[in-house]
């Protein structure tokens, strides 16, 4: 967050309360050498305990709590944009409604265009990545079922054709049937 409360520093001077820690303001303390770049303030008497900002904003305390909270904020922001570590990703528990809609879509399309993925994600209140990964996993599941012989490999059209062929065979005699089966 942004510092909002003024505070006093040990040895005099003022600063801002940031994350519960008083930090030195760099406005007056920082100096600009002839090369034009800001350098850490020499007036920072407790320099070993703080990181002085090079852009004239604020010096930050190196307390573990503050570093930890800044790291958490950074990690959260990175993960919002899909740049965070995959180790911390949480397993998505899809609702029954979400699963039925995803399965319905998968029945018609094994692969989604980006536009369709965005549309489905918005409708089901998921993000694009969740929809994309669900479809990848579902295709792998289908492939595994086909390999094990538990699902037809032709997709929905193949199932309809198989059902049609099965009904044709039941209404007409099999070429392999015995002659006794015809004399009823």
Curated annotation (Swiss-Prot):
Residues 166-184 have a biased composition (Low complexity). The keyword Cell membrane does not apply. GO terms for cellular component: nucleus. Gene3D superfamilies: Homeodomain-like. Residues 87-146 bind DNA. Residues 140-184 are annotated as: Disordered. It is found in: Nucleus. Sequence-specific transcription factor which is part of a developmental regulatory system that provides cells with specific positional identities on the anterior-posterior axis. Acts on the anterior body structures. Belongs to the Antp homeobox family. Labial subfamily. This is Homeobox protein Hox-B1.
């Amino acid at each position: 967050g942004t510092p909002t409360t003024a505070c006093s520093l040990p040895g005099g001077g003022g600063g801002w309360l940031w994350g519960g820690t008083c930090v030195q303001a760099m406005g007056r303390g920082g100096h600009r050498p002839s090369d034009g770049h800001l350098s850490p303030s020499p007036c920072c008497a407790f320099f070993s305990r703080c990181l002085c900002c090079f852009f004239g904003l604020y010096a930050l305390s190196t307390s573990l709590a503050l570093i930890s909270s800044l790291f958490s904020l950074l990690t959260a922001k990175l993960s919002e944009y899909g740049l965070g570590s995959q180790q911390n990703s949480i397993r998505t528990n899809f609702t029954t409604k979400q699963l039925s809609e995803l399965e319905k879509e998968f029945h018609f399309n094994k692969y989604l265009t980006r536009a369709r993925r965005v549309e489905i994600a918005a409708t089901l209140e998921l993000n694009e990545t969740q929809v994309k990964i669900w479809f990848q996993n579902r295709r792998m599941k289908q492939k595994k079922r086909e390999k094990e012989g538990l699902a037809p490999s032709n997709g929905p059209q193949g199932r309809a054709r198989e059902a049609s062929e099965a009904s044709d065979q039941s209404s007409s005699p099999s070429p392999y049937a015995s002659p006794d089966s015809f004399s009823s």
